[in-house]
Amino acid sequence: MWLLLITSVISTFGGAHGLFGKLGPGNPEANMNISQMITYWGYPCQEYEVVTEDGYILGVYRIPHGKNNSENIGKRPVVYLQHGLIASATNWIANLPNNSLAFMLADAGYDVWLGNSRGNTWSRKNVYYSPDSVEFWAFSFDEMAKYDLPATINFIVQKTGQEKIHYVGHSQGTTIGFIAFSTNPTLAKKIKTFYALAPVATVKYTQSPLKKISFIPTFLFKLMFGKKMFLPHTYFDDFLGTEVCSREVLDLLCSNTLFIFCGFDKKNLNVSRFDVYLGHNPAGTSVQDFLHWAQLVRSGKFQAFNWGSPSQNMLHYNQKTPPEYDVSAMTVPVAVWNGGNDILADPQDVAMLLPKLSNLLFHKEILAYNHLDFIWAMDAPQEVYNEMISMMAED
């Protein structure tokens, strides 16, 4: 409702009286696709489609080298970046090159690959089902871990000729990593080190308003949002980024709305990039994926999706209740960064996770950081990225 009010005020007074002046000229990347965003800054880009075992067609993007190190044609160490919930590969390239992890890695000599989970803007195709069908959207992060990660990682290993790669996950990108690398030993052997940013397994202590949404009964949630896509990107999101949140008077309102869901850290948000952030987010997922997270909030457990009845769970798991994931079974070396001000990956949940990581190499809690600071914070290079790149160089 407040958004409708704001847009009405802008339409009425903004043009006629010069009120609500923009913070600056718009950023062209707000209206670009992933390949265009990469090449806009002078980096090379390759685009691939990876087909999963169950037929989903995933958009995968590659930055094979940096702007100034193309002369070294030998094999480069490979890094795979996996985004979080309702997000996409654009998260890793949304800031300026010296502030975006994907570009920094490419300039540091790495072969950088960007993944997209099924159902988001860049992975909304299937060999068998149309995105208009309910069947297409019958997935959660279970399937991303079981099918998306193996398909993408195996493709990268085959394409590059590298036996092992570095894996960087943010938010749900860590979740599917924990599942895949603890349940699929063959896949786990292909990972050098797992770099987990704002890691999420249990969400027992999350303080985000999403916690309250999680207690909406499933039947009512489906009545409100349907059974297919959840929070897809729309033209209204673009409008918010270019015409609302880019206004001097309103950027604070937009940033505070973001902070309510992810935790507050005002000084680290580059409001001049709002149009890029909102030009590509949210990128969508399935209603089932969100319901899976709601289930974890209510149960306090890190478990597979509950299909709604003992008989349905028996069909999927051969047991009446969804099985819990055993993170301690993962032997991949892992480095963890979490935020003390993160209300999605709450520090208490992270504290429960850390003892279960049998091969924990490194842990750092950044007290001021919220959930999104790991991908967008202005000081992310100093707090996280430079440290990570140094660790990769020693691996």
Swiss-Prot record:
Transmembrane segments: none annotated. The keyword Secreted applies. Residues 77-376 form the AB hydrolase-1 domain. GO terms for biological process: lipid catabolic process; malate metabolic process. The keyword Secreted applies. The active site is at S171 (nucleophile), D342 (charge relay system), H371 (charge relay system). This is Gastric triacylglycerol lipase. One of its GO terms (cellular component) is mitochondrion. Belongs to the AB hydrolase superfamily. Lipase family. PROSITE patterns: LIPASE_SER (PS00120). Its main location: secreted. Catalyzes the hydrolysis of triacylglycerols to yield free fatty acids, diacylglycerol, monoacylglycerol, and glycerol. Shows a preferential hydrolysis at the sn-3 position of triacylglycerol. Keywords: Disulfide bond, Glycoprotein, Hydrolase, Lipid degradation, Lipid metabolism, Secreted, Signal. It is an enzyme of class 3 (hydrolase). Glycans are attached at N33, N68, N98, N270. Pfam families: Abhydro_lipase. Secreted by the serous (von Ebner's) glands at the back of the rat tongue. It catalyses: a triacylglycerol + H2O = a diacylglycerol + a fatty acid + H(+); 1,2,3-tri-(9Z-octadecenoyl)-glycerol + H2O = 1,2-di-(9Z-octadecenoyl)-sn-glycerol + (9Z)-octadecenoate + H(+); 1,2,3-trioctanoylglycerol + H2O = 1,2-dioctanoyl-sn-glycerol + octanoate + H(+). Its EC number is 3.1.1.3. It comes from Rattus norvegicus. It is found in: Secreted. Residues 1-18 form the signal peptide. Disulfide bonds join C245-C254. GO terms for molecular function: lipase activity; malate dehydrogenase activity; triacylglycerol lipase activity.
